[in-house]
Curated annotation (Swiss-Prot):
<dbReference type="Pfam" id="PF00395">
    <property type="entry name" value="SLH"/>
</dbReference>
<keyword id="KW-0677">Repeat</keyword>
<dbReference type="InterPro" id="IPR001119">
    <property type="entry name" value="SLH_dom"/>
</dbReference>
<dbReference type="InterPro" id="IPR051465">
    <property type="entry name" value="Cell_Envelope_Struct_Comp"/>
</dbReference>
<comment type="function">
    <text>Links the outer membrane to the inner membrane. Long fibrous protein that could serve to separate the two membranes.</text>
</comment>
<feature type="repeat" description="3">
    <location>
        <begin position="326"/>
        <end position="350"/>
    </location>
</feature>
<feature type="coiled-coil region">
    <location>
        <begin position="85"/>
        <end position="379"/>
    </location>
</feature>
<feature type="repeat" description="2">
    <location>
        <begin position="251"/>
        <end position="275"/>
    </location>
</feature>
<keyword id="KW-0472">Membrane</keyword>
<feature type="domain" description="SLH">
    <location>
        <begin position="21"/>
        <end position="81"/>
    </location>
</feature>
<feature type="region of interest" description="3 X 25 AA approximate repeat">
    <location>
        <begin position="208"/>
        <end position="350"/>
    </location>
</feature>
<dbReference type="GO" id="GO:0009279">
    <property type="term" value="C:cell outer membrane"/>
</dbReference>
<comment type="subunit">
    <text>Homotetramer.</text>
</comment>
<keyword id="KW-0175">Coiled coil</keyword>
<feature type="repeat" description="1">
    <location>
        <begin position="208"/>
        <end position="232"/>
    </location>
</feature>
<protein>
    <recommendedName>
        <fullName>Outer membrane protein alpha</fullName>
    </recommendedName>
</protein>
<keyword id="KW-1133">Transmembrane helix</keyword>
Length: 400
């Protein structure tokens, strides 16, 4: 009776597949069996018009749909509920990587904003420099006109003032060179940081692509194991059909061995479930820790941006004070030079602080990348252990 029911079920599946399979996949195509197998298991269901479109490139959305159906199939047919936790872990891991990629993109935007603000500050400094030169030239021309009127009366005073103006011009040139050098160093640091961040983003994308390859490899291995299992089931059914009476007699003889084998399989299944739960907890803890660390990095970058904005506002206020004092006489210009020296010291201090913050963020990002790489190694070890245990179960079944 069981054989009749099994035959009817197989015929119903076969004829339903014949009438509902993709019409654009010919039977003589080299991939016909593979496509049919995926369609039969509900992994590939085709497009709304009922065709498979095998020559069309697959999109990331379609790949995600196929992988999701594959995980559902594994959960229902292969692991009897045990792989549901593994599928959830893989899904959570994918969500975490997407969130991580969004945060990295946000950090890139923040760095671009900082670079734009520094460029604006540099332009403001250039404009201030031009205005200072114009006012110095105007003062110089005015003084020279006064000197021309009184040169015959006080030649010594004229020479002293000319010497002071020359010293002031040289001091201003030195200050200009120092400011230009500092701005160039800041631009180089920003360029290096953008390049390094681009490399980190490329590494993260490589890690995501690596997980996609792992999922494809898992699918290929499961398909291979499933095909081998189907072949062995078919061979077993054929042997059972020829030796039904012999097996019935041997069941009583080997009943104890069968019970022992069942107990071993149950123990292996229990151990596998325990390892999966332990691995899930460990991965969840690591992912939560990485997320907290990335939030800290993001907060520090926001603080750095706020401090830079405050410093830029302070620099603009000092520029306004410089513009007011330029209209004064020689002593006021000397005082302006003293303020410029103080501003240069402040700029050096802020530059050093910015470099330290950039190095700190860089070190933290490198630590996060190492943590992600360590997690990938642990996931590869877990995958190898899973298929190793599955292979032992298949060997035990085939041996009996």
């Amino acid at each position: 009776m069981k054989r009749v029911l099994l035959t009817v079920a197989m015929l119903s599946v076969f004829f339903s597949a014949m009438f509902a399979f993709f019409p654009d996949v010919p039977k003589d195509h080299w991939a016909y069996e593979y496509v049919w197998k995926l369609w039969q298991r509900g992994i590939f269901i085709g497009y709304p018009d009922g065709e498979f479109k095998g020559d069309r490139y697959i999109t990331r959305y379609e790949a995600a749909t196929a992988v999701s159906r594959l995980l559902d199939f594994i959960e229902q047919k292969m692991l009897a509920g045990a792989s549901g936790d593994l599928a959830q872990v893989v899904g959570n891991l994918s969500d975490k990587y997407m969130a991580l990629e969004e945060k990295v993109n946000g950090l890139t935007g923040i760095l671009d904003t900082l670079a734009s603000q520094i460029g604006t500050t540099q332009a403001n400094l250039t404009e201030t420099e031009r205005e200072l030169l114009e006012k110095i030239d105007a003062v110089k021309e005015e003084i020279e006109m006064e000197f021309d009127k009184e040169i015959s009366l006080n030649r010594e005073v004229v020479n002293n003032i000319g010497l002071k103006l020359g010293n002031l011009s040289r001091d201003y040139e030195r200050y200009k060179e120092n400011v230009d050098a500092k701005i160039s160093e800041v631009n180089e640091k920003l360029a290096a940081l953008e390049k390094d961040l681009g490399n980190k983003i490329a590494d993260l994308e490589g890690i995501v692509n690596l997980h996609e390859k792992d999922i494809i490899n898992i699918y290929n291995k499961i398909s291979s194991v499933n095909e081998e299992l189907n072949n062995k089931i078919a061979a077993t059914e054929e042997k059972l059909s020829r030796k039904d009476e012999e097996i019935s007699a041997m069941v009583e003889l080997h009943e104890k061995d069968i019970i022992n084998l069942y107990n071993k399989v149950a123990a292996l299944n229990e151990d596998l479930n325990k390892k999966i739960l332990d691995t899930k907890a460990e991965l969840s803890a690591k992912i939560e820790s990485q997320e907290k660390t990335l939030n800290m990095v993001y907060t520090k970058l926001l603080d750095t941006e706020s401090k830079l904005n405050d410093e830029i506002s302070a620099l603009k206020e000092k520029d306004a004070e410089i513009q007011k004092t330029v209209d004064l006489h020689e002593q006021d210009i000397v005082n302006l030079y003293g303020k410029t020296s103080s501003l240069e010291e402040d700029l050096n201090m802020k530059y050093n602080e910015t470099n330290e913050k950039i190095d700190q963020v860089k070190a933290e990002l490198e630590d996060k990348i190492e943590s992600v790489k360590a997690y990938n190694r642990n996931l590869s070890i877990l995958t190898g252990a899973f298929f190793g245990i599955l292979g032992l179960i298949l060997i035990a079944i085939s041996g009996k």
